[in-house]
Swiss-Prot record:
Record-listed E.C. numbers: 6.3.4.23
Protein name: 5-formaminoimidazole-4-carboxamide-1-(beta)-D-ribofuranosyl 5'-monophosphate synthetase
Binding residue positions for ATP: 156-166, 199-202, 230
Catalytic activity: 5-amino-1-(5-phospho-beta-D-ribosyl)imidazole-4-carboxamide + formate + ATP = 5-formamido-1-(5-phospho-D-ribosyl)imidazole-4-carboxamide + ADP + phosphate
Superkingdom of the source species: Archaea
């Protein structure tokens, strides 16, 4: 694991008057880059030719670093360019997927916003479950084996795959039938099936809750919420049940978009308590814990209980739903505030207070 001292030694060589904010051109990079510009930073977008169109059209990137493949971001020459540009990298789901978690932890020698140690805790289901449970959050019942299935379950797989390959089953037989079908279609592998995460299917309404923890203020902020727009399930439910049966289509849960939502106000104390508990436990289990953005993906059942089924320990894709600010982020200072701008504001404050060691790794 790259040490904090190694990163601070690199940062000490930076020109502090020319700090840039960099990220991979994907996932949540539009508001990360735009937010940085609004806070006065120059921005760097790592991208491929042909994939640079949105960042040029929206004019959010001051500099481009072109790669043949997104996975090239881990290469030493790209790291050297980022260091030459005095870059602080903001990680997101695509960055972690393409760079590779092992590389992020052990060989990506560029200062990153946040705690790079905690990223494994969102990626590995066992660690994620440990953190959520020990924080005292309500989580779905977990099944250790397909043979244990005794009710309706949802089957998920490791990594940031945006819901691809997820399926619902109500018996051991149905699990193996659907898994085999997805394998034949090239969506799952034997390794995926062996590592399947099987959990209770919770019936409820979806709230993906976007928090920001500021180490500088020691405060958990609520910036926004969204629900997921998924294919093909959200199209499938528009078809009458009789026709669905005749069509014999297997539902899938691939995230294709995000829809902003607000939660009933009486549930906000529960929302804040969940964020506070997670931050406190993360400090204990994975010091220094959460830094900056994190997300709790939850379902609200008919008893008005929020059940957390997934966690993001970095900026989540749903933050795209409030690029120009949202109802909750507006309440803090009466201004439109995206997650990207909130990240940049924390970096700017840390530079001004000479507390950059509190927010980078």
């Amino acid at each position: 694991m790259i040490s904090k001292d190694e990163i601070l030694e690199i940062f000490d060589k930076y020109n502090k008057d020319e700090i840039t904010i960099a990220t991979l051109g994907s996932h949540t990079s539009l508001h990360i880059l735009k937010g940085a510009k609004l806070e006065g930073f120059s921005t760097v977008c790592i991208t491929m030719k042909g994939r640079d169109v949105p960042y040029k059209r929206f004019k959010v990137a001051d500099k481009f670093i072109y790669v043949d493949n997104f996975s090239d971001i881990k290469n030493e020459e790209i790291q050297e360019k980022l260091r030459e540009l005095n870059s602080i990298v903001v990680p997101h789901g695509s960055f972690i997927a393409y760079c590779g978690l092992d590389n992020v932890e052990n060989s990506f020698l560029v200062p990153m916003f946040g705690n790079r140690r905690i990223l494994r805790w969102e990626s590995e289901r066992s660690l994620e479950g440990k953190l959520l449970r020990e924080a005292g959050l309500r989580v779905p019942k977990k099944y250790e084996s397909p043979e244990d299935i005794d009710g309706t379950v949802i089957v998920k797989f490791p990594g940031a795959r945006g819901g691809r390959g997820y399926f619902i089953a109500s018996s051991t037989e149905e699990f193996y039938k659907k898994a085999e079908d997805l394998k034949k279609r090239g969506i799952l592998t034997d390794e995926d099936i062996a590592n399947a995460h099987i959990e209770e299917y919770v019936v409820g309404t979806n709230f993906c809750i976007h928090y920001f923890y500021s180490p500088l203020k020691d405060e958990v902020e609520l910036l926004g919420m969204d629900k997921r727009y998924e294919s093909n399930i959200d199209g499938l439910v528009r078809i009458p049940a009789k026709d669905q049966l005749e069509m014999n289509i297997n539902p899938s849960y691939v995230i294709t978009g995000n829809i902003p939502v607000v939660i009933r106000e009486s549930l906000l104390p529960q929302v804040f308590e969940m964020g506070d508990k997670l931050v406190a436990k993360a400090k204990e289990l994975v010091p220094p814990g959460m830094i900056g953005p994190f997300c709790l993906q939850s379902l609200c059942n008919e008893n008005l209980e929020l059940v957390v089924f997934e966690m993001s320990a970095r900026v989540d894709g749903g933050t795209n739903s409030f690029m120009n600010g949202g109802p909750y982020s507006f309440l803090y200072n009466g201004e439109p505030l995206s997650m990207g701008q909130r990240i940049a504001r924390e970096i700017k404050m840390a530079l001004q207070l000479d507390m950059i060691d509190k927010i980078i790794s």
